[in-house]
Amino acid sequence: MPGVVMDNATVGGPRRASESPDNVSSTPFPQERVNQSGDSGDRRNRSIFHNGAVKGAQGPGQHIETHTGKDGINESEGLPELAHITQGFFPFSTLVNRSVQQCWNDLSELVTELAAIQVSPHGQMPSTPANGKAPGDQSPENLQKKTRILDFAHAKRAEFIKLLVLSQWSRQAGDVSRLIDLQNFIRNRHQAFMDALQRIGDMKRDLVQAQVANPDLKTALEVLSKGRVVSITDLGYEAPKQLTAKGALKRLHKINRIISARLALHDTIPRPFRTYRVHDGRATFVVQGEFELDLSVGEESKSSQFFFVDIRFLFSPSSHVPKGRLSNELDVQVNDRLRDNGLKGCFDFLHGLVLTNKITILFKQAVELARGLWSDVLRVELLHRTLVVQYWALKLGAKSWIEIGIKSGRKPHDVKDSGVPYLALRWIRDGQEVDSTSVEFDADDLSMERLLRSIIALHISHLLSATYSILNQRSLFATGLLSLQALLNTNEPGKCQLLAQLTVSRHLRVSIEPMSGAIVLSADPSPLDRSESDSSLEKSSVDDIVSRVSRLRCIAALEEAESTVKILGFETVSPRGLKADVRKILPPNILRFALFWHPFWDRSWIVAATSSTDGDSWWVIHLRRPSALATSALNLDKDIHREATVCSGHVISNTFLAVQHLARDSSFADLSHCLSGMVAIHANASYLADLRSVAFQPPLRALKFESGLEVPNLLVRYQVSTLPRALQLVFPAGVGKKDFIRNTVRVAFHGIDQRRKVVIFVAYGNLLVPMKELSTLVSKLDGSLVFKQEGDSFAIRLLAPAGQPVIVQLFESLQRLECMLSIFEFLRRKKLVIRSLSLSQVAFAYGPRRSLAAVMDIGMSKLSNSEQLDPVDILARTDPLLLLRLGIRFDHSNPHRRIQGSLAAILNHTSNKAALDSVAEILSFTLPAMRTLDQITSNLSRGEPARLQVVVRNAFTFLLHYINYALRFELTASQHAGRLTWVLRESGDPQVGPGQDQIRAKLRDTLYNSNGNGWKGLGNGVVADVEGVCSVISNLDTSFAGARDNQETSGDVKPTERSLNQTDVKNHRDHDFDAQAAMDYDTSAVATNSAGARSSQQCDAPPEAADVITID
């Protein structure tokens, strides 16, 4: 049995004589080749068995290796022994050896595999169970090893069990081997019987050709001798007469009548055959676009069949049916159909033949195209009677093809059609079947190239039309800002184009290459991007075309915008240097954007030009710069915006097509002016939005370019009470906080100062109460403040780099303006002459004839750099950032110049609510005394050494020191008899010096014990009113002047040359009394006399308020 392992002891080995039933020799069988017919061969079988397969073994239909005892058979020796089959057998020992060798190899691999598994030497040892048996190492690696060993043992055990079964079976396989031999013998005999039958049949067939009829010598002899055979009957046929032309014509007319009558009265003519004509003895049926068929009859009987005469095809390209076998076969087939099925059967056969012929012609044309110009782009396949042509084969995505086949049923839109099969076209475009009625498919004039061009033209028209519809919905094209035109053609694909205007000066032509289907984009005047402009073999879907056109339009728009702004000095900012992605703040429809920055701007602000098919926009983007240390390091880098974080972004214009308008009709500087203005306005609006407590209009999202690229104004609600505490000015107590300005201030952008590289803002506001005098009083030297002629509105100029807010400066200026207006109102109420006004000072005139001039300064003390503070820091502060400081100045000829420091201290006193009234009262009260002192000190007629020094303690306390006599006098203001008066007393140690007795005696006579106009002696001093103090000071000085003249005449006393230096002044202050005590005294003296000066003397006199004046 082939494939069964036989034991050598029973199969394939020598047999004992007792085991052979036919007494065959027990020697090994001779190795001879015997075929199935019993013929012995000469070639010896020298095949060697390897692993159960015989080298050079033959198949079942070939010779079989057998063993026979002898070449011939002798009947006296009995029947021959059956051929013994050994093909496919191999020794059992070979299988055992191979199994053992395989087991050894697998065991070696197992050992190698187990050695590669590392077992941890310090595995966790579980505790000993109660039975005392240790479970051993239970680590996963050790368990894996054990599992592999068990699997190997089970597998090999199963294999050796199979070997054991085979070994037991092979010891009893002798009977099976004999059965195999018997079966082989029966098969050989059956095959020999079948071969005999085949040979008999072949012989019978071959003998047919060898048959020869017996010769009819009698008939042959009669024919040769008499020329006829009497035994053959004469049918009586006569030879036809020669047919003349007239007879032929007559017979043709007769046939015509027969055919006409038959077709008109008897035969059923199918609808396609109803167009016919009878002529020349035949009927010619015309099937439009297919063929002309000539039929005729052979008998007059109405039931006789028509016979085929000729056929001519009416479509092109076509050819006549060649004479010969094809024509004869066609004649037979048509006549058979006419005989069996009449005219209808004939039409059905020829109609199907023509349709198949047309499909074949189209197939040949398509193959020729695929081998020629359309190579690699067409795929042609003929399935039964359906032609499939795939075009644009190299395109990715959904495929497109056409199917031309025979379709049964009624034609669409043909009422008269009787359901005859026709040549139909099926169009699958991008994987979807579409209507093919618009395809130019002429079944009469077959042209595959024309059909393909029509199909491709319709496909391209569909793509471009869909692209046009999508793009025309975008705002740029829908509103007519950009032109869009689609040129479509249903027959010629090369004439299908989409013309799109990218910018004012650039246009794009979109077409699709007919053969390959590649998108071709060509820009005019020049290609923008080679990767975008060249043809692409990617899938030409509508979305892809729209995407590429949109991308090119955005590239063109940004190119023009970038080239324009670079001329204006803008620099490009790389988005890669920013920490955050700018696209996060931009709408998702933005396809391209570019970032720009101007050197005049703050680094925290940039602009972005964005472009999409819905419109082009300018954006203002706010950046958060790194820390101060990082910023200083970045200053050395070329990219100053690196590592900046994007905070916010707002659109400022929905188009920058005006860039071309500016370039054509205006100067480039206008664009820089507009963008800088929008950056500046947005910086201030963003600052106000972060403050949250100050309302403004319009909101950030509405701050956009107005008509004519005008920068919008910012309306800010100004109300001091709603301002953050840090931005509220701390006014001196003497300046009343009164509202003068209406609560809406308009901040407008007024250009750029190119020299100082700053943006000019103008804040426009209105006053609650008009003051007509303001317009003429504003100083022309200060251009930061202007009042309208009616005096009801004002304008304040503010300067700052673009991107830095002026909000703090605005609120500071407005509050300073209110302070200035408060001072103006006070001076006007006091009927003082105001000469000029500005935010920093108020100049006025006073005195009896308004001959004295004074300037009141409005200064500012900043606790920190408020311009650099973040709004969050401002909101977090509870203390004010700005302190308003008032000062007063006099010219060098004004007698009040000595007390301007003291007056400034009074103006800025934190608790003196009547400081302005106090200063006005002091100016009026001290003017006579100051003038007298000024007259004495300004007497330069004599070149004398200095004899008098005047030390100003405060506005109400003066120290008069006569150097020659070492005498000091104190002139103070105090209350006397219910009114404010001047009091003169001697100050210092009551020591007697040279000449002092004489002076004191003279002073007692002329001052202390005397009375005068407006003054009165007190014994140890003098009290005088406002006007009387002039006489007191003059008499005092006259006494010292007369005493000096007497001393110089007698020569008794030498003048003291020592002057009172600053140290003496200081010692004198410390020795007598401090300034605060003196001021308190002065205040108590003035309080009962003037209600307006009730608290004017409660401020300290600083050291710088003391003026030392030396009299020459």
Curated annotation (Swiss-Prot):
InterPro entries: Med14_N (IPR055122), Mediator_Med14 (IPR013947). One of its GO terms (biological process) is regulation of transcription by RNA polymerase II. Residues 64-73 have a biased composition (Basic and acidic residues). Residues 20-39, 1088-1099 have a biased composition (Polar residues). The keyword Transcription applies. Residues 1-76, 120-141, 1088-1112 are annotated as: Disordered. The keyword Transcription regulation applies. One of its GO terms (molecular function) is transcription coregulator activity. Coiled coil: none annotated. GO terms for cellular component: core mediator complex; mediator complex. Keywords: Activator, Nucleus, Transcription, Transcription regulation. Disulfide bonds: none annotated. It is found in: Nucleus. Pfam families: Med14. Component of the Mediator complex, a coactivator involved in the regulated transcription of nearly all RNA polymerase II-dependent genes. Mediator functions as a bridge to convey information from gene-specific regulatory proteins to the basal RNA polymerase II transcription machinery. Mediator is recruited to promoters by direct interactions with regulatory proteins and serves as a scaffold for the assembly of a functional preinitiation complex with RNA polymerase II and the general transcription factors. Component of the Mediator complex. PANTHER family: MEDIATOR COMPLEX SUBUNIT, MEDIATOR OF RNA POLYMERASE II TRANSCRIPTION SUBUNIT 14. Belongs to the Mediator complex subunit 14 family. This is Mediator of RNA polymerase II transcription subunit 14. It comes from Aspergillus clavatus (strain ATCC 1007 / CBS 513.65 / DSM 816 / NCTC 3887 / NRRL 1 / QM 1276 / 107). The lineage of its organism: Eukaryota, Fungi, Dikarya, Ascomycota, Pezizomycotina. The gene is rgr1.
